[in-house]
Curated annotation (Swiss-Prot):
Post-translational modification as stated in the protein's UniProt record: In response to cellular stress, acetylated at Lys-77 by NA110 and then gradually deacetylated by HDAC4 at later stages. Acetylation enhances its chaperone activity and also determines whether it will function as a chaperone for protein refolding or degradation by controlling its binding to co-chaperones HOPX and STUB1. The acetylated form and the non-acetylated form bind to HOPX and STUB1 respectively. Acetylation also protects cells against various types of cellular stress.
One GO location term (cellular component): centrosome
Region span, Disordered: 614-641
Sites of Phosphoserine modification: 631, 633
Family membership noted in the UniProt record: Belongs to the heat shock protein 70 family.
GO BP of this protein: chaperone cofactor-dependent protein refolding; lysosomal transport; negative regulation of transcription by RNA polymerase II; positive regulation of microtubule nucleation; positive regulation of proteasomal ubiquitin-dependent protein catabolic process; protein refolding; regulation of mitotic spindle assembly
Modified residues (Phosphothreonine): 636
Residues with the Omega-N-methylarginine modification: 469
Binding site for ATP: 12-15, 71, 202-204, 268-275, 339-342
Protein name listed in UniProt: Heat shock 70 kDa protein 1A
Modified residues (N-acetylalanine): 2
Membrane-spanning parts: none
Length: 641
């Protein structure tokens, strides 16, 4: 096996991408369809599980069992208003499991529930397989990216998804920081530059300001919205056309999942068209109750429908500039990342905000994040290529971290935009006389009161010797590692008694046992997928062999060289097999193979006799002419629009 390499995975809301750094450069790896990005979708059918393009391609036929947007659920509570709002747009069911959201689907005739981590792990497994196919050997080490504005629970849940997928997650890094590496890697030696990364993807939005100076990438500030992206623009278009259909045809199909799914696919296509044309047309045959829906939309109308969303991208830009204590004139480069930055209006708003400055479009907005992640993966594996060995990444914590003190006040130990890894210690004391213990409640957020912030976890430090209030000294240490994941320790200085928490037993987190179980299930699903692939392979082989034999004996050129009795024998047996195939499309692999042997026993003696008689070499495996006919023989294709 080759020396161990590590891959970089951009796990996106709508699309994911994987890269590897080898021989001094990054390769973005194409999937089996030849695409360099893969849809972050997983579909469950009566017979199999599909991931990526295969899942997205059948979504109109199977909307309620095709899961996407797991990134909008991961690390969130079921009661989160964001989750509740999103559920209105999703065709699949999300259920409440102890305030953790769970996706419910029908798979192989059974109702199954999956946590967002499991769905994301399936996408990660797919990306891992794409890389393994390209490299030709197993891969286990990976760097996975997350939005810079992801909080602790979202980061931890993403890391868990990697573990379930059988990956050793070397590091979780921020998407804009990864993109900055892609941008700055070949631009060394130009002196210090302040770079603003504007990353607007399918579901999340980040702004990061970095200083790049001779291989040192230092993040100065980060801001964003973990719930803004291309999907939200699609939603506006969908709502617009649902209303238009109501006006024109007096019918409402907003509850018909298949119709809405077909409309959404058309809207996504129209949105992309509007980045290069000023008008796009939608043509959907028999959208609802047999009515064809032919309509069009102009770029101006699209911009008007999304104007508030587009404008809202500038608030994080202002916030990041304030936090970095920079004036907009001090930014040297404005770098666009994420597919949604192709929208002309988004570019214009950013350009106008920076007084007409040119935007830098030199990196591929879809691939930059995976590119940077692949570089970081190589560095963590100790790659000594000259262009990466001196590279240093200094990232920041996106949100302030602290604990609750008397009266529900948030006391921050680590301020937002502190460079990580970092460690801060502070002394606290008791609030009442002879208090036997203290409850340490850890929060993240920017508000003054803890009730407005996000509770990450809590633990008790007990056994404090009786003493008047204010006497005991409790030393609390917050320690953030390079993944942006927090450890908190509390020590009673008088007794040396300590207690610690890695914020992993946050209520939304999966326990070690659950992760173990999911790892085993992931293996099981993978094995089932393999069996299904082999089954289909055996079925197709039998089918093409039967049609092949049929066409060989019916060949006009063989007239007179084969007796009618033999010809009838072969044709009857072929017909019998083809009829059996039609009736048994779900048979097992060995049944298909057994049928093939039966057929070969009839055909082989006749066919080989034929070729010996003709003096020609045997036909070997015959170049199967693909004569797929009849129902059940060969795939039945339906246009998905």
């Amino acid at each position: 096996m080759a020396k161990s390499v590590a891959i970089g995975i951009d796990l996106g809301t709508t699309y994911s991408c994987v890269g590897v750094f080898q021989h001094g450069k990054v390769e973005i790896i194409a999937n089996d369809q030849g695409n360099r990005t893969t849809p972050s979708s997983v579909a469950f059918t009566d017979t199999e599980r599909l991931i990526g393009d295969a899942a997205k391609n059948q979504v109109a036929l199977n909307p309620q069992n095709t899961v996407f947007d797991a990134k909008r659920l991961i690390g969130r509570k079921f009661g989160d208003p964001v989750v509740q709002g999103d559920m209105k747009h999703w065709p699949f069911r999300v259920i409440n499991d102890g305030d953790k959201p769970k996706v419910q689907v029908s798979y192989k005739g059974e109702t199954k529930g999956f946590y967002p981590e499991e769905i994301s792990s399936m996408v990660l497994t797919k990306m891992k397989e794409i890389a393994e196919g390209y490299l030709g050997h197993p891969v286990s080490n990976a760097v996975i990216t997350v939005p810079a504005y992801f909080n602790d629970s979202q980061r931890q849940a993403t890391k868990d998804a990697g573990v379930i997928a059988g990956l050793n997650v070397l590091r979780i890094i921020n998407e804009p920081t990864a993109a900055a590496i892609a941008y700055g890697l070949d631009r060394t030696g130009k002196g210090e530059r302040n770079v603003l990364i504007f990353d607007l993807g399918g579901g999340t939005f980040d702004v990061s300001i970095l200083t790049i100076d001779d291989g040192i990438f230092e993040v100065k500030a980060t801001a964003g919205d973990t719930h803004l992206g291309g999907e939200d623009f699609d939603n506006r278009l969908v709502n617009h056309f649902v209303e238009e259909f109501k006006r024109k045809h007096k019918k409402d199909y907003s509850q018909n999942k298949r119709a809405v799914r077909r409309l959404r696919t058309a809207c996504e296509r129209a949105k992309r068209t509007l980045s290069s044309s000023t008008q796009a047309s939608l043509e959907i045959d028999s959208l609802f109750e047999g009515i064809d829906f032919y309509t069009s939309i102009t770029r101006a109308r699209f911009e008007e429908l999304c104007s508030d969303l587009f404008r809202s991208t500038l608030e994080p830009v202002e916030k990041a500039l304030r936090d970095a204590k920079l004036d907009k004139a001090q930014i040297h480069d404005l770098v666009l990342v994420g597919g949604s930055t192709r929208i002309p209006k988004v570019q214009k708003l950013l350009q106008d905000f920076f007084n007409g400055r040119d935007l830098n479009k030199s990196i591929n907005p879809d691939e930059a994040v995976a590119y940077g992640a692949a570089v970081q993966a190589a560095i963590l594996m100790g790659d000594k290529s000259e262009n990466v060995q001196d590279l240093l990444l200094l990232d920041v914590a996106p949100l302030s971290l602290g604990l609750e003190t008397a009266g529900g006040v948030m006391t921050a130990l680590i301020k937002r935009n502190s460079t990580i890894p970092t460690k801060q210690t502070q002394i606290f004391t008791t609030y009442s006389d002879n208090q036997p213990g203290v409850l340490i409640q850890v929060y993240e957020g920017e508000r003054a009161m803890t009730r407005d912030n996000n509770l990450l976890g809590r633990f008790e430090l007990s056994g404090i010797p009786p003493a008047p209030r204010g006497v005991p000294q409790i030393e609390v240490t917050f320690d953030i590692d390079a993944n942006g994941i927090l450890n908190v320790t509390a020590t009673d200085k008088s007794t040396g008694k300590a207690n610690k928490i890695t914020i992993t037993n946050d209520k939304g987190r999966l326990s070690k046992e659950e992760i173990e179980r999911m790892v085993q299930e992931a293996e099981k699903y993978k094995a089932e997928d393999e069996i299904q692939r082999e089954r289909v392979g055996a079925k197709n082989a039998l089918e093409s062999y039967a049609f092949n034999m049929k066409s060989v004996v019916e060949d006009e050129g063989l007239k007179g060289k084969i007796s009618e009795a033999d010809k009838k024998k072969v044709l009857d047996k072929c017909q019998e097999v083809i009829s059996w195939l039609d009736a048994n499309t779900l048979a097992e692999k060995d049944e298909f193979e057994h049928k093939r042997k039966e057929l070969e026993q009839v055909c082989n003696p006749i066919i080989s006799g034929l070729y010996q008689g003709a003096g020609g070499p045997g036909p070997g495996g015959f170049g199967a002419p693909d004569l797929k006919g009849g129902s059940g023989s060969g795939p039945t294709i339906e246009e998905v629009d």
